[in-house]
Amino acid sequence: MAIRRIEGLLHLASEGRYAILVGRFNSFVVEHLLEGAIDTLKRHGVSEDNITVAYAPGAWELPIVAKKLAASDKFDAIIALGAVIRGSTPHFDFVAGECAKGLGVVALESSLPVINGVLTTDSIEQAIERSGTKAGNKGSEAALTAIEMVNLLKAI
């Protein structure tokens, strides 16, 4: 008996419906993440009709909007994008931690892929690097993960 292998395939992207959830805070970074995510979805065959972009004020609000999007049954995956940049107070730790935790809870409770594309960086420079310059575009990477997860869950 052969071992069965289950994987999500990137070439089946056109079959999915994707919500991109964007935290507007630090928009100078997040806009590039959004561009990267949309470009990646489209390059993998996703029609613009199957992409919805929703905006929240910031990373703190992403989990509750993700929960509402998941409950709508209109999407196969949610891609959460945002940028939390460390400052001189502990606010960063609370926002980054609760955002990640909340997105994870939504994914588990809804059985829907909720991809965490929220940058958590120590500096503005790091955030800029991860939004399309030296360190690639994490929005694009999040979109690839969403495509793979949609197809993986369909294959199970």
UniProtKB/Swiss-Prot annotation:
<feature type="binding site">
    <location>
        <begin position="88"/>
        <end position="89"/>
    </location>
    <ligand>
        <name>(2S)-2-hydroxy-3-oxobutyl phosphate</name>
    </ligand>
</feature>
<dbReference type="InterPro" id="IPR034964">
    <property type="entry name" value="LS"/>
</dbReference>
<comment type="function">
    <text>Catalyzes the formation of 6,7-dimethyl-8-ribityllumazine by condensation of 5-amino-6-(D-ribitylamino)uracil with 3,4-dihydroxy-2-butanone 4-phosphate. This is the penultimate step in the biosynthesis of riboflavin.</text>
</comment>
<keyword id="KW-0808">Transferase</keyword>
<comment type="pathway">
    <text>Cofactor biosynthesis; riboflavin biosynthesis; riboflavin from 2-hydroxy-3-oxobutyl phosphate and 5-amino-6-(D-ribitylamino)uracil: step 1/2.</text>
</comment>
<dbReference type="GO" id="GO:0000906">
    <property type="term" value="F:6,7-dimethyl-8-ribityllumazine synthase activity"/>
</dbReference>
<feature type="binding site">
    <location>
        <begin position="59"/>
        <end position="61"/>
    </location>
    <ligand>
        <name>5-amino-6-(D-ribitylamino)uracil</name>
    </ligand>
</feature>
<comment type="subunit">
    <text>Forms an icosahedral capsid composed of 60 subunits, arranged as a dodecamer of pentamers.</text>
</comment>
<keyword id="KW-0686">Riboflavin biosynthesis</keyword>
<protein>
    <recommendedName>
        <fullName>6,7-dimethyl-8-ribityllumazine synthase</fullName>
        <ecNumber>2.5.1.78</ecNumber>
    </recommendedName>
</protein>
<feature type="active site" description="Proton donor">
    <location>
        <position position="91"/>
    </location>
</feature>
<dbReference type="InterPro" id="IPR002180">
    <property type="entry name" value="LS/RS"/>
</dbReference>
<feature type="binding site">
    <location>
        <begin position="83"/>
        <end position="85"/>
    </location>
    <ligand>
        <name>5-amino-6-(D-ribitylamino)uracil</name>
    </ligand>
</feature>
<feature type="binding site">
    <location>
        <position position="116"/>
    </location>
    <ligand>
        <name>5-amino-6-(D-ribitylamino)uracil</name>
    </ligand>
</feature>
<dbReference type="GO" id="GO:0005829">
    <property type="term" value="C:cytosol"/>
</dbReference>
<feature type="binding site">
    <location>
        <position position="130"/>
    </location>
    <ligand>
        <name>(2S)-2-hydroxy-3-oxobutyl phosphate</name>
    </ligand>
</feature>
<dbReference type="InterPro" id="IPR036467">
    <property type="entry name" value="LS/RS_sf"/>
</dbReference>
<comment type="similarity">
    <text>Belongs to the DMRL synthase family.</text>
</comment>
<feature type="binding site">
    <location>
        <position position="25"/>
    </location>
    <ligand>
        <name>5-amino-6-(D-ribitylamino)uracil</name>
    </ligand>
</feature>
<dbReference type="GO" id="GO:0009231">
    <property type="term" value="P:riboflavin biosynthetic process"/>
</dbReference>
<dbReference type="Pfam" id="PF00885">
    <property type="entry name" value="DMRL_synthase"/>
</dbReference>
<dbReference type="GO" id="GO:0009349">
    <property type="term" value="C:riboflavin synthase complex"/>
</dbReference>
